[in-house]
């Protein structure tokens, strides 16, 4: 009896699991209509925050914006709104209620825009969605943005939800890792992944004693991205993976305590950055790559397609130097940084979308710039690094 029971349990467990790897079946992105040009932003920022008397600081901020390699950024906050809410423009004025009132509504709404596009590309009824993974660093509420999205989209009430708050910039990798595990361990699962970020929680005026906060004001922007993730695509209804996920890992870098911190206060979400973040990442990236690609026998990092969270150009520059990467390796990453800025968790998903679109446009052999294997890196508070090994598909 024991053997029969064990056998049937094994059979049940086997039947519950997918046969193949998790794949990204569709991608959708969305941004607020309002956008700012980086070249004009220092003048706008110091004017709207009533800080034009801080001329030296404004010059520093101009240099930060120039070095950012960003051309434009999308932002929900408009000049009209900020004029009506001057407490959000001061550096340390109590303003959390106003910020929360914005993000608890706008974060799921922007997420819905991206999700609708992903579901449309997927081409299947939304009733087939079994799981929702929602990620944001913009505000906290109960019930959460996952619940609000479920209602906005009209998903089944029995959909299984996971809400991730306050993870930061590495979380685009985290959601892929979680979606991979859900898809591969639940036969027939279709996971809707949404990352939605709005800088209304972090926007504030300048301070000449907190330059790390000013760095964030030069980089951060708003955007949402959504994916449908599932294993064993049903080709009879047109499902086809864009990328497959082979492995996923997370690690805390040594000697990196306090390198990136964020704290929710009465004044909103405050960020603190150390100057040596690019150095800490580049110093440890070889170890992450070795661990991820040793099973595949790959050690030529130029043979991979690259998707790296664009925390800023200095991080990308130092990673390129450390690994001897060719300039074109970070093309998709730098393009997204230039056209959208740092959208925190949503960035790497935007880069996936950019890469598959450019690959199709250029007529190369695969979704990964013509290459078979790729890597996706998320970097963020901790310092935490997410490493996802990707397999492209033929075009």
Curated annotation (Swiss-Prot):
Top-level taxon of origin: Eukaryota
Coiled coil: none
Residues recorded as bearing N-acetylvaline in the entry: 2
Listed Pfam families: Chal_sti_synt_C (PF02797), Chal_sti_synt_N (PF00195)
Record: active site: 169
GO molecular function terms listed in the Swiss-Prot or TrEMBL record: naringenin-chalcone synthase activity
GO cellular component: endoplasmic reticulum; nucleus; plant-type vacuole membrane
Pathway it works in: Secondary metabolite biosynthesis; flavonoid biosynthesis
GO biological process, one term: response to UV-B
Protein name, per record: Chalcone synthase
Physiological role: The primary product of this enzyme is 4,2',4',6'-tetrahydroxychalcone (also termed naringenin-chalcone or chalcone) which can under specific conditions spontaneously isomerize into naringenin.
CDD domains: CHS_like
Protein EC: 2.3.1.74
Catalytic activity as recorded in UniProt: (E)-4-coumaroyl-CoA + 3 malonyl-CoA + 3 H(+) = 2',4,4',6'-tetrahydroxychalcone + 3 CO2 + 4 CoA
Native species: Arabidopsis thaliana
Sequence similarity: Belongs to the thiolase-like superfamily. Chalcone/stilbene synthases family.
Keywords (A to Z) from UniProt: Acetylation, Acyltransferase, Flavonoid biosynthesis, Transferase
């Amino acid at each position: 009896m024991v053997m029969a029971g064990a056998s049937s349990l094994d059979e049940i467990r086997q039947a519950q699991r997918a046969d193949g790897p998790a794949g990204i079946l569709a991608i959708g992105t969305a941004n607020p209509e309002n956008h700012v040009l980086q070249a004009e932003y220092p003048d706008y920022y110091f004017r709207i925050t009533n800080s034009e008397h801080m001329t030296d600081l404004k010059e520093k901020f101009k240099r930060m914006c120039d070095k950012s390699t960003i051309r434009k950024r999308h932002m929900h906050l408009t000049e009209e709104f900020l004029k009506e809410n001057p407490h959000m423009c001061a550096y340390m004025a109590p303003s959390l209620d106003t910020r929360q009132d914005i993000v608890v509504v706008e974060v799921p709404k922007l997420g819905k825009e991206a999700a609708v596009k992903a579901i449309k590309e997927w081409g299947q009824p939304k009733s087939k969605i079994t799981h929702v993974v929602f990620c944001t660093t913009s505000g906290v509420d109960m019930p959460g943005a996952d619940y609000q999205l479920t209602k906005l989209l009209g998903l089944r009430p029995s959909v299984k939800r996971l809400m991730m708050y306050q993870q930061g910039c590495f979380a685009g990798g985290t959601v892929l890792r979680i979606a991979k595990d859900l898809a591969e361990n639940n036969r027939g699962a279709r996971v809707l992944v949404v990352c939605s970020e709005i800088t209304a929680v972090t926007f504030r005026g300048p301070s000449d004693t907190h330059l790390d906060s000013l760095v964030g004001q030069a980089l951060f922007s708003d955007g949402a991205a959504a994916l449908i993730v599932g294993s064993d695509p049903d080709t009879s209804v047109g499902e086809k993976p864009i990328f497959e996920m082979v492995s996923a890992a997370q690690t805390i870098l040594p000697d990196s305590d306090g390198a990136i911190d964020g704290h929710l206060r009465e004044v909103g979400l405050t960020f603190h950055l150390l100057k040596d973040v690019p150095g800490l990442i580049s110093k440890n990236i070889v170890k992450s790559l070795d661990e991820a690609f040793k099973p595949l026998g790959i050690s030529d990092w130029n043979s991979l397609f690259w998707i790296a969270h664009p925390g800023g150009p200095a991080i990308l520059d130092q990673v390129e130097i450390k690994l001897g990467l060719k300039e074109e390796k970070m093309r998709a990453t730098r393009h997204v940084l230039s056209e959208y800025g740092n959208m925190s968790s949503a960035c790497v998903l935007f880069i996936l979308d950019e890469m598959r679109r450019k690959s199709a446009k250029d007529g190369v052999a695969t979704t990964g710039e013509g290459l078979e294997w790729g890597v996706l890196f998320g970097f963020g508070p901790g310092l935490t690094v997410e490493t996802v090994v990707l397999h492209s598909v033929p075009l």
